[in-house]
From Swiss-Prot:
Name of the protein in its database record: ATP phosphoribosyltransferase
Purpose of the protein: Catalyzes the condensation of ATP and 5-phosphoribose 1-diphosphate to form N'-(5'-phosphoribosyl)-ATP (PR-ATP). Has a crucial role in the pathway because the rate of histidine biosynthesis seems to be controlled primarily by regulation of HisG enzymatic activity.
Transmembrane segments: none
Signal peptide: none
GO biological process, one term: L-histidine biosynthetic process
Annotated source species: Pseudomonas entomophila (strain L48)
Annotated pathway: Amino-acid biosynthesis; L-histidine biosynthesis; L-histidine from 5-phospho-alpha-D-ribose 1-diphosphate: step 1/9
Amino acid sequence: MLTIALSKGRILDDTLPLLAEAGIVPTENPDKSRKLIIPTTQDDVRLLIVRATDVPTYVEHGAADLGVAGKDVLMEYGGQGLYEPLDLQIAQCKLMTAGVTGAPEPKGRLRVATKFVNVAKRYYAEQGRQVDIIKLYGSMELAPLINLADKIIDVVDTGNTLRANGLEPQELIATISSRLVVNKASMKMQHARIQSLIDTLRNAVESRHRG
């Protein structure tokens, strides 16, 4: 049995057509089903529907053989028990710092609000910058507006939400897309099956990119 961990939303919607190229189609619509384990048209493949931030945990610990996760999630997770063999080139966006539009660069210790705490620590450590990191789970844009933080670190797609709240994107930390991740033990135990799937997905991505 091959178990693939996916999260609902944009990543799931963009991943399903790629899996279909490999003949893997869920027998129920994951967006409408309440089931968290969904069979597919291949008897030996099932889908696990989990939170986006939990995908690498399920894969690293072997509860899933493969998964699809955003590079932002993988950067924050930082686990070592994963292979990352393929950039699926879907759900593309940017991980950036942002601050109040036109505000001067803060002097001294910087206050940064983000849910990407580990990413923020590494980013500012590389700059040698002293920071206080404030963990938030949502509505990041509020933090600079109410003086909770000087800057935020968040995923930016169009930047419209930032601009609507008087903020501007500033420094690019990473360009983000969704990646296929594979459990290391599964890759050894089911190498032929998983490698075949990786190759099929790679061909589908390249074909879509050429098109």
